[in-house]
Amino acid sequence: MALNFKINRQIRAPKVRLIGSAGEQLGILAIKDALDLAREAGLDLVEVASNSEPPVCKIMDYGKYRYGLTKKEKDSKKAQHQVRIKEVKLKPNIDENDFSTKLKQARTFVEKGNKVKITCMFRGRELAYPEHGFKVVQKMSQGLEDIGFVEAEPKLAGRSLICVVAPGTVKTKKKQEKSHAQDENQ
């Protein structure tokens, strides 16, 4: 975030609309008088809105103001959770024990709030029987139904079968679809 406010002597306008440190309107004053008031208060004169005529300036502690802005920005970045797509790769003839391990791995990804891309890779003549891959992917997505929902149905893409499971429930998916439909209608 660019913090490029003009302060004190950087302000070049002959007259400014002044706002006091408590937020009260002090009226339109000459820049010299506004700087004197700020100096008497032991604070800075900061140009808040340069677009208006005359520019709006406020008496405040500029260091404290800048610190507050950067702190707000950091807090808002912390609050955001970036959803990542994690991938779990399977084979159509996977053993039961290996399958349960992959299912546990996928569950931890979904519980942490990430989407899971389930990929069933076919080798050689395994592609002649894609229904085996569909069964494995279906079983995996059913194992994740209580904590997530199928966002993209299983489909064949080259030599692999791909399905995406997102965190949440089917109810949240329906709410998202309704909000998208309302956005498109407006």
UniProtKB/Swiss-Prot annotation:
Its main location: cytoplasm. GO terms for biological process: ribosome disassembly. It is found in: Cytoplasm. The keyword Cell cycle does not apply. Keywords: Cytoplasm, Initiation factor, Protein biosynthesis. InterPro entries: T_IF-3_C_sf (IPR036788), T_IF-3_N_sf (IPR036787), Translation_initiation_fac_3 (IPR001288), Translation_initiation_fac_3_C (IPR019815), Translation_initiation_fac_3_N (IPR019814). GO terms for molecular function: ribosome binding; translation initiation factor activity. IF-3 binds to the 30S ribosomal subunit and shifts the equilibrium between 70S ribosomes and their 50S and 30S subunits in favor of the free subunits, thus enhancing the availability of 30S subunits on which protein synthesis initiation begins. Monomer. This is Translation initiation factor IF-3. It comes from Chlamydia pneumoniae (Chlamydophila pneumoniae).
